[in-house]
From Swiss-Prot:
GO biological process, one term: translation
Family note: Belongs to the bacterial ribosomal protein bL34 family.
Family annotation (PROSITE patterns): RIBOSOMAL_L34
Region of interest called Disordered, as start-end residue ranges on this chain: 1-44
Pfam families documented for this protein: Ribosomal_L34
NCBIfam families: rpmH_bact
GO CC entries: ribonucleoprotein complex; ribosome
Keywords from the named record: Ribonucleoprotein, Ribosomal protein
UniProt protein name: Large ribosomal subunit protein bL34
InterPro entries: Ribosomal_bL34, Ribosomal_bL34_CS
Length: 44
């Protein structure tokens, strides 16, 4: 049985990257809350 997590940089960026977060209202809300919390890394 193969593992479920098969890393891909492109897929990671497209699903969880900064530009993808900025493209939706809720994504911007995620970034805002992470800024508020003081996260060093905002997105993948």
């Amino acid at each position: 049985m193969k593992r479920t997590y098969q890393p891909s940089k492109i897929r990671r960026q497209r699903k969880h990257g900064f530009r993808h977060r900025m493209s939706t209202k809720n994504g911007r809300r995620v970034l805002a809350s992470r800024r508020r919390k003081g996260r060093k890394v905002l997105s993948a």
